[in-house]
A protein has these predicted regions:
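Sec-dependent N-terminal signal peptides
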Residues: 4-13
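Glycine-rich beta-to-alpha transition loops that act as phosphate-gripper elements at the mouths
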Residues: 95-99
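N-terminal organellar transit peptides
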Residues: 19-94, 114-116, 127-236
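Catalytic-histidine neighborhood of serine endopeptidases
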Residues: 124
Length: 236
């Protein structure tokens, strides 16, 4: 009986958590909006619970072709897994305000990656603060059989290398220049690097879009210049 009651409590907890995470999402026509900066969210950051929500909303709404992101970051591991989910759905990604830290991994999953005028993409290397590490060690030391903090440190080293390798792979798969990828990992977690639009497009982070896709072709002014075939990906 106690086991059954515990099972019911776990189901209720998971349902409430999922519902709370769903508050980050809204749908308008063909666009799924993901916003971790809303007020009163249970977890106002990119979290592992969001993986299920992304999968659910995209499966239930096959008309969605764009995902609009607004987030200052969160769990690097969650962002990497959401990248994998979005990659399956062949959607475009859009940023109209800011997408930073772990959110970048989600943005790079876009088939086409739009950056609105004035919007920001922020980069820094992933980090794990001391308080969270202490909590993780206390919660999982028996399960993982860590006899002391030295064994835990060895595990952290391996996990850090794994996360870094996944970031490199995602950036490479998305067509991002290796030089920029390396530069992002040089930025301390307490800082944030916001590259210029030119830097982002040159490095393959933001897509180059044919003019006809964005707005009608205008008659070129007589400046002795040829009309460009491509322009920076901007949405007005």
């Amino acid at each position: 009986m106690k086991t059954f009651l515990l099972f019911l409590l776990l189901i209720t907890f998971n349902a409430n958590l999922t519902h709370a995470e769903d508050a980050k999402f809204t749908i308008e026509e063909d666009t799924l909006y993901y916003n971790t900066e809303k007020k009163d969210l249970k977890s106002g950051y990119v979290s592992y619970s969001d993986i299920y929500s992304f999968r659910k909303f995209l499966n239930e709404n096959p008309n969605i072709s764009k995902v609009n992101l607004n987030s200052s970051g969160g769990s690097a591991g969650a962002g990497l897994e959401i990248f994998r989910v979005l990659s399956d759905f062949n959607v475009d990604t859009v940023v109209s305000n800011e997408c930073s830290s772990a959110c970048i991994n989600i943005f790079l999953a876009g088939n086409v990656r739009w950056l609105h005028l004035g919007a920001l993409l922020g980069f820094h290397r992933p980090d794990w603060d001391a308080v969270s590490m202490q909590e993780y060690f206390n919660n999982y030391k028996e399960e993982e059989k860590w006899s002391d903090t030295f064994e835990f440190s060895n595990w952290i080293q391996k996990d850090t290398i794994l996360i870094t390798s996944k970031i490199f792979k995602n950036y490479t798969d998305a067509g991002v220049n290796v030089s920029l990828t390396v530069d992002t990992l040089k930025i301390d977690n307490d800082d944030m690097w916001y590259p210029s639009r030119q830097e982002l497009t040159s490095a393959g982070v933001v897509s180059l879009i044919p003019i006809a896709v964005n707005k009608p072709q205008l008659r070129p002014m007589n400046l002795g210049l040829s009309s460009p075939e491509l322009k920076l990906s901007m949405m007005e």
